[in-house]
């Protein structure tokens, strides 16, 4: 099973940016833990991070035929990007939306997600563990279908 984790804008700063909200682990630390978990779950996990909406869309489109499931933390694009939504729907690859913080306990403008209503699921608010929970969820789903 081949999976892709896409991280959007400013997630390259995790561990440095607002640690009281996003935690102190770096994206590299989180990814290292996820690789271990993916191996335990008999899954392969690739990573992509970009601050550019267009690059994220290109990555999604290029994953057709090689990726079975997507984990996506679109960062601020979660709340603004119909284009990301359309790309995810266009490739018809199952995806799980993931966020480090609970987007529904933050500013009101963060309460709207253009991705969650079509996602397999949404995991948010558990810090770095949100990624692990999302990974376990999508692997469980893909093993059943």
Curated annotation (Swiss-Prot):
GO molecular function terms listed in the Swiss-Prot or TrEMBL record: 3-dehydroquinate dehydratase activity
Gene3D superfamilies in alphabetical order: Dehydroquinase, class II (3.40.50.9100)
CDD domains registered for this protein in UniProt: DHQase_II
Pathway(s) of this molecule: Metabolic intermediate biosynthesis; chorismate biosynthesis; chorismate from D-erythrose 4-phosphate and phosphoenolpyruvate: step 3/7
Reactions this protein catalyses: 3-dehydroquinate = 3-dehydroshikimate + H2O
Function statement: Catalyzes a trans-dehydration via an enolate intermediate.
HAMAP family, per database record: AroQ (MF_00169)
Name of this protein: 3-dehydroquinate dehydratase
Species whose genome carries this gene: Prochlorococcus marinus (strain NATL2A)
């Amino acid at each position: 099973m081949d999976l892709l984790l896409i991280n959007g804008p400013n997630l390259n700063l995790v561990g440095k940016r607002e640690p009281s909200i996003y935690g102190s682990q770096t994206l590299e630390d989180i990814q290292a833990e996820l690789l271990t978990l993916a191996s335990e779950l008999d899954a392969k996990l690739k990573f992509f991070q970009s601050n550019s909406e267009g690059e994220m869309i290109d990555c999604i489109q290029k994953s057709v035929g090689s990726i079975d499931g997507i984990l996506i933390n679109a960062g601020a694009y979660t709340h603004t990007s119909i284009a990301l939504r359309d790309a995810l729907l266009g490739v018809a690859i199952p995806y799980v939306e993931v966020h480090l913080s609970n987007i529904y306990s933050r500013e009101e403008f963060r309460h709207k997600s253009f991705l969650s209503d079509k996602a397999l699921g949404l995991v948010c608010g558990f810090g770095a563990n949100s990624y692990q929970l999302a990974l376990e969820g999508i692997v469980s789903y893909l093993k059943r279908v």
